[in-house]
Amino acid sequence: MKEGIHPKYNDVMVKCACGNSFQTRSTKTEISTEICSACHPFFTGKQKLIDTAGRVERFRKKYGM
């Protein structure tokens, strides 16, 4: 590898909007996220089902189908 062409690799704290934080390595100095594995519905098991049937019924009612 050539010297002097690679960016500096730092230890960084990643801070989530939910208050969770964890350490990783990156070329950035700080990382802020809105959602992480501690608060994402897929990882927490608190997924919401989308009511697509209601939307279809509203469409059919609106356009007389």
From Swiss-Prot:
Details of cofactor binding: Binds 1 zinc ion per subunit.
The protein's GO terms of the molecular function aspect are: metal ion binding; rRNA binding; structural constituent of ribosome
Q: Which cofactor does it need?
A: Zn(2+)
Residues noted as binding Zn(2+) in the record, renumbered to the chain: 16, 18, 36, 39
Instruction: State the UniProt keywords alphabetically.
Output: Metal-binding, Ribonucleoprotein, Ribosomal protein, RNA-binding, rRNA-binding, Zinc
One cellular component term (GO) for this entry is:
ribosome
UniProt key word Hydrolase: no
InterPro entries in UniProt? Ribosomal_bL28/bL31-like_sf, Ribosomal_bL31, Ribosomal_bL31_A, Ribosomal_bL31_sf
Protein name per the record: Large ribosomal subunit protein bL31
Identify the species of origin. Geobacter sulfurreducens (strain ATCC 51573 / DSM 12127 / PCA)
